[in-house]
Amino acid sequence: MSSKSNVRSFLQSSLGHQNRPANPEQWWHAVCKVTPNLCMSGGISNNNVTARKQLSEWEAAGVTHYIAVHEECNRGHFVATNSNIEYIYLGVDDDGGKRDPKWFDEVTSTALKILEDPNSVLMITCWMGVNRGPSATYAVLLALGWESQRALHEIRTVRPIACTIYSVDAVKWWVKRTGGDSQQVRKACAEVEQWHAENPLDMNYLIRAIGSRTGA
């Protein structure tokens, strides 16, 4: 793939025709631990009964902090009044467009500060836990020193519905952030593209399945 190719079109195309995990809706609100201190899931439900159940499950898993990266809704007041979890809202739209490097800066700086305390457990979610949340988690893992493909593999292993389409933006941000030159940026992006080509998911199927079976 040339450096001038449309990376996001490539990812969305490769994610549109391949693997379909069984019962993806069962993963929507599942607590998926990437490390003992870093988790992913789907966003807090707008149904208060379901939302209270989610918060109870999160607290049982040790979650102390929650970064919500979905723009659709802000449940900060509900979380504050129904749990002891600290809520941080860093929502962005899931429009398939390029992620602003400043967003990755904000997510990772917030996460790293939280994770300085070894007793903290951080939850990161978007709404479905398919793209924005896993991509933000991927950026945090890079900032923690993880190798790029290992981070992608671990995210997919613990959350099989994680398409993580903004991972190319994340790795580009990270290489530049750490002083990499244009050649290093191209190499890192190509490695992420290759990983997605070798590990495709049917993103459209996942989103339809979760939405139609849960009312998301």
Question: Where do the model's predicted regions map?
Answer:
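PTP/DSP superfamily signal
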Residues: 2-18, 105-122, 128-130, 135-216
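Amphipathic coiled-coil/heptad-repeat helices and related helical stalk/stem segments
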Residues: 24, 50-52, 107
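Class I SAM-dependent methyltransferase core
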Residues: 68, 124-125
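Acidic, metal-coordinating catalytic cores used for nucleic-acid/nucleotide bond scission
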Residues: 71-73, 96-97, 128-132
